[in-house]
């Protein structure tokens, strides 16, 4: 592999590993009453580490990170080298969704058959319509068979998601994020679009259970709690 190509693979694989490391750290934080926001600040203040890609969440997706990690793993295999860190990076990333879903199961004691959830954000990251390896789609495919309905909203990629999810019958797409609260019990956020930063708390309280599952840890737990809205994040 030429140095230029290996450098590109390595850069993306390193960032993917950084994300998986932080997500695994979030499991420790939850067991020890630590707070990932404070941990991120502490780690990020070290100039050797920096503050980027230190957000606990649902894991990485898109085309570049998964593809480049896989390329390095393939190279290791072909060269007869031991597969270690990169293999764990993928494993942790895959398991992070289950870690998040367990929060929903715990809240509802696994009794989801009559529940309607609103999902905000479908793309793998904000400001794109790219659904490749989007964690939101994996979440929908796992959750849909267990619930009454999923109400879906994304600022720009509803149409593409309709094609991707065409075989799932108990989902409904909305063009307005608040109309997606129709008869909904809870909000699940999968992508941190900027338009989700400023939320109408009165609308949130209209959710049957007034609960938000924040898969990207970008809302303020204390503010939502003061507004009588239950907040469930990752490692906070």
Across the structure, where does each feature detected by a protein language model lie?
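Structural/interface elements that position substrates and couple domains in central-metabolism enzymes
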Residues: 1-236
